[in-house]
Structures are given as C-alpha cells and as structure tokens.
Amino acid sequence: MNAPRPHDLLWGMPVSGLPTDAPQWALEVLASGQPVVVRRATCEAGWVAVGLRGHGRAQRLGALMRLTDIQRQQGPEALRVHGQSPWPALQALASVTPVLQARGLAWGPTGGVGYQLATGMEVVHAGSDLDLLLRTPRPLARAQARELLDILDCAPCRIDVQLETPSGAVALREWASFALRVLLKSPHGPRLVSDPWAVMERAP
C-alpha cells in the first residue's frame, strides 16, 4: 500500500479512533463503513490526518487514523464517471475527461463527486461544484494554465482544480491569474509563493 496522500479515501478507521466528544453523526459514519479522506497536515509517525464527512458542509470533522487500521485506499485517479447523470457536476466530469486525459497527467475528482463515485452514496446535487486534483510534478506554464482554465470554464458547472506540486497544492484558477504570488497549501500550513514548484517562500 502506498503512503496516503491528500484527498485519498481510506477505509477501516474504527469508531474507537474518534475522540470521546465526537458528534453522533461521526460515529454513524464510521459504524456504517464509510471512508475518511486524507487531510493535508503533519502528524506523528504511524498516523495520518483525515476528515470525516456527514450530511452537508456543517458536518465535517478532523481526526487522526492509525496507518495500521487502513484496510483499503483509493486515490482520485481511480475515479471516473460512467453513464449519464442529471447532475451538472457529473456531466462536467464526463465532458472534461478527454481534455484532461490529453494532458498526460494523473488526475481525478475529489470532494462530493469523488466521494459519490467511490462509495455510491448520493451526495451530489444540482448545485454541486466539481473539484478536481491534477498532479503536476513539473512546472505548468501559466499560459498553459490559462488555456486549460478557459476550457474548463465552459463546463455546465463551476470546476475548481488543485494543482498538486511536490511542495503542496495551488488552485489552477489562481495560478492562471496574473498575481505575483499565489497561495500554496502545504502540510505545514498555507504559504504565499511566487513559484509553487520551487522551495517554499514565506510571505513577508
């Protein structure tokens, strides 16, 4: 099993792994065998930072999971939409799949769309956005980022793409802008950087 990465879904976390003051909905999530999602945070060896997802944005909980409890692991790259859907977010995923495949980079859906595709649970609705992760181990030219964003903005719903670099993640929309510095989400917290692929620079 590979080391868990942000946005991976993990199965196997026991209810006993939750803090004693965890809300009832979180206990029910684990008791029903639902996965948790890997968060971008540092923790002690042998543990991984995860998040639990309930109904709606109000039901979110951060926790820690033992690596030895992981029974199954699935990354966004393994998730694809099959068949037709009435929901714009899933329609958007189907429409942009050829565009992203042509880039030759690893990518996949995260957020509600990824969760639904991985679990079969109906969490996507008419107002859902599409969240995508695009692994970019090498620098992506800002002109290329703008070209890709122009294509994605023609989809039937808003698409938010995170470019996963060796140092962390940056929003495609922000990298495609003309900002001198962009927000890089790293395991050690957010940083403003001029180059997300270079050594992280702390904003003054």
Swiss-Prot record:
InterPro entries according to UniProt: Holo-ACP_synthase, MdcG_C, MdcG_N
Annotated GO MF terms: nucleotidyltransferase activity
Keywords recorded for this protein, A-Z: Nucleotidyltransferase, Transferase
Annotated catalytic residues: 129, 131
Family, per entry: Belongs to the MdcG family.
Function description: Transfers 2'-(5-triphosphoribosyl)-3'-dephosphocoenzyme-A to the apo-[acyl-carrier-protein] of the malonate decarboxylase to yield holo-[acyl-carrier-protein].
Protein name: Phosphoribosyl-dephospho-CoA transferase
Organism the protein comes from: Pseudomonas putida (Arthrobacter siderocapsulatus)
Originating gene: mdcG
